[in-house]
A protein has these predicted regions:
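Glycine-rich, flexible loop segments associated with nucleotide phosphate handling
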Residues: 61-71, 110-112, 166-170
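In a subset of proteins, long, contiguous C-terminal domains/tails are tracked
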Residues: 15, 31-33, 72, 77, ...
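Extended alpha-helical regions
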Residues: 5-9, 14-24, 114-116, 120-126, ...
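Helical hinge/lid and interdomain linker segments adjacent to catalytic or ligand-binding clefts
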Residues: 1-98
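Catalytic beta-strand/loop cores that center a nucleophilic Ser/Cys/Thr
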Residues: 101, 108-110, 116-224
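A structural signal for well-ordered alpha-helical segments within the folded catalytic domains
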Residues: 4, 65, 69, 89, ...
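Short, solvent-exposed coil/turn elements at secondary-structure transition points
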Residues: 23-25, 87, 105, 179, ...
Length: 236
């Protein structure tokens, strides 16, 4: 469903695009694309897909290990992968990105936003956020919030937290959830404690390319037009 919303929005705004199926990723020439979007989907569905006995063969299965390696090589050679919401968990885990989803294992009894408008603060100086206002709104539907993984160096005096990440894999923070008064419309529980000030969008370098992680769905149901720009800017 998320792929359909994404495709509809891009077609509506006259973006040239291809829908990539499993074999296109595994065996195709990905270098022809400036960006590859991974719509919101579970890691299991991306990697393994649906079983052959539940769907026609052309719609079953996933990209598998070969597809994952193809995506990794694509980014390392200069491509950009754009992950929306749930698919960001898959890329963080499988590509070993130095960032984490801080609400991944948080129980719904302490933090829950089933589908609400939340405030986000944008770093407007970057080309990926061009045209956005510093204060904006995102649609949060059981979505993600990120934080950079701290590196620790063990020396003679014990462990020391490194304040700066080595230049080989920098993380560029593009948007954060507001620190307070996060909820704009809808219902939320535990929002300030769990996502207040956390990263909502980031770009992580990978070889000569990068992975853009958008913790929410900027194109959800083709409705939140104010965040379409975050998706569009990520394509170039």
């Amino acid at each position: 469903m998320d792929e359909g919303w994404t495709r509809w929005v891009l077609e509506k705004y006259n973006f040239p695009l291809d829908t990539l199926h499993n074999q296109d990723i595994i065996n195709g020439d990905l270098s022809q694309y400036s960006a590859i979007i991974i719509p919101s989907q579970s890691g299991s569905a991306i990697l393994h897909g649906y079983a052959d006995n539940t769907y026609p063969k052309e719609y079953s299965g996933g990209i598998g290990l070969n597809g994952l390696l193809a995506l990794k090589e694509y980014a390392e050679k200069g491509g950009r992968i754009v992950a929306l919401d749930e698919s960001s968990d898959f890329l963080i885990e499988q590509l070993g990105l130095p960032i984490k989803n801080v609400v991944k294992n948080t129980p719904s009894t302490t933090f829950f936003i089933p589908g609400s408008l939340v405030r986000i603060d944008i770093e407007t100086s970057d080309q990926l956020t061009f045209g956005m206002r510093k204060e904006s709104v995102a649609y949060f539907v059981r979505s993600r919030a990120f934080d950079i993984i701290e590196l620790r160096d063990t020396g003679e005096g014990g462990k020391e937290t490194l304040k700066q990440r080595p230049p080989s894999q920098p993380v560029k923070i593009l948007a954060r959830y507001a620190k307070k008064d996060i909820l704009l419309s809808g219902w939320a529980m535990g929002e300030e404690k769990n996502i207040g000030g956390k990263i909502a969008m980031a770009e992580v370098s990978l070889g000569r390319g990068s992975v853009v992680l958008i913790g929410f769905r900027p194109q959800f149901r083709a409705q939140p037009r104010n965040t379409f720009k975050l998706l569009f800017n990520s394509l170039y």
